[in-house]
Amino acid sequence: MATVDRWLLPDGIEEVLPPEAARIEVARRQVLDLFQSWGYEFVVTPHIEYLESLLTGAGSDLDLRTFKVIDPQSGRQMGFRADITPQVARIDAHTLKREGPSRLCYAGSVLHAQPRALSSSRSPIQLGAELYGDASPSSDVEVISLMLAMLQLADVPDVHMDLGHVGIYRGLARAAGLSGEVEQQLFDALQRKAIDEVVALTANLPPELASMLRALVDLCGGREVLDAARDRLAGAPAPVLEALDDLLAIADRLAARFPQLPLYFDLGELRGYHYHTGVVFAVFVPGVGQSIAQGGRYDDIGADFGRARPATGFSTDLKTLVTLGQAEIVLPSGGIWMPDSTDAALWQQVCQLRSEGQRVVQALPGQQVSAAREADCDRQLIQHGEHWQVMPLAS
């Protein structure tokens, strides 16, 4: 094996070095403290699980992104987590089994067999929050507001948000009686805004339903889109109108809370269609070709764990958040250089200093005070009689 092969990392797999690793850890603590202040409880999920458990309730996209291995003890197939959200849903539905609303949050590394987008990391640090047990738009507004508060905490500039609702397309597709194959083809065409394909795929449908499905292609833009949707989808089935009402209610409350936030609506944007069941949302910033935070409602996932529960939430990549954020993350600087000594009084003083939050670095045999600079120390412990004093490091 060539020497280069011993240190070469796979594409999309990164190591994080100081001081960036410290900045990420400080940001992680700040965001989790924010979540806690909103009532969200922290949970930790396993890095690897049996595959059928890991992928329960998830779409095919997650299956393709999951690294798979064979457990040498059981012989069963296992997977490294590619998304923490289904694991947290299982905790709520199967482990906690609470009756009322439950708020959970998490932060941890995930591993992707395939990158989410070109040049994306395959080892992001996924961070997010989930709210279970309430199906009202108020829950969606809460998690979106928390997501935006997180971005404000990180001081990510120039954010704008996309909002949609998969229930609008799903309700129209069911009313049209589309087969699974045609529904998937129409879904793909809508994502590409391929109007000619949409027209062809809806040619044999009742004219009113065909017209409403075709309208989804260009029902995108600012707040006026929702007013236009009320007119163009006026004859839609009740579930479609209910979905539109929910989207309107969410949009109005967000506009009141965040009047400076640009909102963009796309009723043909079906991000996570096979996974989400209601409102879907994503945050974008200029110069980044993919969303930096995203989420939505996924009420069906708990049923796969034996207990259906309404659910809504969001996630982001902590490393991306730190990279894009302009908030000043203050890292501890400086430290105290401790000589290599067996003096008991020195040890007692060092323990006291560390308990007070001071950073104390011990010299190793043969190291001189000059090594203290390399260890980012600006002070040193010097013995005066029986006592040790903290003094500035000599130039």
Curated annotation (Swiss-Prot):
GO biological-process terms attached to the record: L-histidine biosynthetic process
Protein name: ATP phosphoribosyltransferase regulatory subunit
CDD domains: HisRS-like_core
Function, as annotated: Required for the first step of histidine biosynthesis. May allow the feedback regulation of ATP phosphoribosyltransferase activity by histidine.
SUPFAM superfamilies named among the record's database cross-references: Class II aaRS and biotin synthetases (SSF55681)
A Pfam family assignment: tRNA-synt_His
PANTHER family given in the database record: HISTIDINE--TRNA LIGASE, HISTIDYL-TRNA SYNTHETASE
Localization: Cytoplasm
Signal sequence region: none
Species for this entry: Pseudomonas syringae pv. tomato (strain ATCC BAA-871 / DC3000)
Gene: hisZ
UniProt miscellaneous comment: This function is generally fulfilled by the C-terminal part of HisG, which is missing in some bacteria such as this one.
Cellular component aspect of the GO annotation: cytoplasm
Keywords tagged on the record: Amino-acid biosynthesis, Cytoplasm, Histidine biosynthesis
